[in-house]
Amino acid sequence: MSNDGDLNIDNLITRLLEVRGCRPGKPVTMSEAEIRALCHKSREIFLSQPILLELEAPLKICGDIHGQYNDLLRLFEYGGFPPEANYLFLGDYVDRGKQSLETICLLLAYKVKYPENFFLLRGNHECASINRIYGFYDECKRRFSIKLWKTFTDCFNCLPIAALIDEKIFCCHGGLSPDLQNMEQIRRVMRPTDVPDTGLLCDLLWSDPDKDVTGWGENDRGVSFTFGPDVVAKFLNRHDLDLICRAHQVVEDGYEFFAKRQLVTLFSAPNYCGEFDNAGGMMSVDETLMCSFQILKPSEKKAKYQYQGMNSGRPAVGGGRPGTTAGKK
């Protein structure tokens, strides 16, 4: 078993950031021992912090990244590299993209370096049965070993599953659950844990809003449920909350409101899988809980290998639009 002696966190972060400006997809040189040590150290930190995080604004919230490492670097260029800004990521760091290892290693490294300012929630892809199939297992096996993939699984099984920002914004990867009556139920989930096929933890990572549903509906994914605007309104009212912030679905503009701006979906992987023309969105929450959005535009098809640097994003919706403030009414 590795120990933390194998881990020089500053040196690792430096190497991970050195590929900025290089051709997208350039692999970062890392050793299996240091990645293993990174997993062990970050796992310790996850277990030392609550499974339901209680965070304070200001912070920036990001949705799915899915191994699109170059786009993760673009997000940080735009929002500020830690510790310049505080961050909450909503899960789905691995699978589908070409550089899941660089992506998860940079995120875990920032967690170790800035444990009180940088937060990661669990997505449905931070689960062995899913990332065994959709790319992460194959990437670990090809570049290092199956054993390393298992070490990541042990780390992912300890990630927090939801966050409350100033007791007003509820954040999770997927959505609500018919089993969720009070926040204490989330706090009672014991870690390490796999993601079960049904129940509260499954729903928080897998469910989706559906404007055409009242109450709860079947989910086309074959897992969990869909929930209607009435469920959102009821949940916010019961818990004295203002907004649900979640990820889990590709949305064209990088962010999309639902249920009269009571729920927002964030998706932070532009040109997802190279198959969509979606933008990537990041939500900034200021001290007054005003929410605004920073957008990474999808890259032009013809500029496939052109580095997309500081000017690749454009600010979206100015802060003053009605319904974008949570909390301070």
Swiss-Prot record:
Q: Provide the residue positions that the database annotates as binding Mn(2+) 2.
A: 64, 92, 124, 173, 248
Q: Where does Mn(2+) 1 bind?
A: 64, 66, 92
Q: How is the cofactor bound, as the UniProt entry phrases it?
A: Binds 2 manganese ions per subunit.
> Which keywords, in A-to-Z order, does the entry hold?
Cell cycle, Cell division, Chromatin regulator, Hydrolase, Manganese, Meiosis, Metal-binding, Mitosis, Protein phosphatase
Its Enzyme Commission number? Answer: 3.1.3.16
State the InterPro entries in the record. Answer: Calcineurin-like_PHP_ApaH, Metallo-depent_PP-like, PP1_catalytic_subunit, Ser/Thr-sp_prot-phosphatase, STPPase_N
Identify which residues the record assigns to the active site: 125 (proton donor)
GO molecular function ontology, one term from the record: metal ion binding
**Catalytic reaction list:** O-phospho-L-seryl-[protein] + H2O = L-seryl-[protein] + phosphate; O-phospho-L-threonyl-[protein] + H2O = L-threonyl-[protein] + phosphate
Gene Ontology CC terms: cytoplasm; nucleus
Highest taxon, organism lineage: Eukaryota
User: Which Pfam families would you find in this protein's record?
Assistant: Metallophos, STPPase_N
Q: Which cofactor does it need?
A: Mn(2+)
Q: Which family does it belong to?
A: Belongs to the PPP phosphatase family. PP-1 subfamily.
Give the protein's biological function: Serine/threonine-protein phosphatase which antagonizes the function of air-2 in the regulation of chromosome cohesion. Dephosphorylates histone H3 at 'Ser-10'. Dephosphorylates translation initiation factor eIF2alpha. Involved in the activation of chloride channel clh-3 during cell swelling and meiotic maturation.
- Write the protein's name: Serine/threonine-protein phosphatase PP1-alpha
Q: What is the lineage of its organism?
A: Eukaryota, Metazoa, Ecdysozoa, Nematoda, Chromadorea
* Gene assigned in the entry: gsp-1
